[in-house]
UniProtKB/Swiss-Prot annotation:
Cellular compartment(s): Cell membrane
Keyword Transcription among UniProt keywords: no
Main location: membrane
Name by which UniProt lists this protein: UPF0391 membrane protein Sden_3712
UniProt entry tagged with the keyword Membrane: yes
A single cellular component GO annotation: plasma membrane
Keywords of the record: Cell membrane, Membrane, Transmembrane, Transmembrane helix
Record membrane topology: Multi-pass membrane protein
TM segment ranges: 6-26, 27-47
UniProt cross-references to InterPro entries, sorted A to Z: DUF1328
Family named by the database record: Belongs to the UPF0391 family.
Length: 58
């Protein structure tokens, strides 16, 4: 039980440091950009698969 307490304490301290230093805002901005890049790549992949006429892999 003490191990879990220490683990959550460390996680809370790291989250607090990241949240109060402004790194979290930058990381959220980067995450949004990466999300939209991968959505576009997914759509390109789906369209190219549909146009090629290949059946999906089993």
């Amino acid at each position: 039980m003490l191990g879990w307490t220490l683990t959550f304490l460390v996680i809370a301290l790291v989250a607090g440091v990241l949240g109060f230093t402004g790194i979290a805002g930058a990381a959220a901005g980067i995450a949004k950009i990466i999300f939209f890049v991968f959505v576009v790549l997914l759509l390109i992949s789906l369209v190219s698969r549909a146009l090629s006429g290949k059946p999906p892999r089993p």
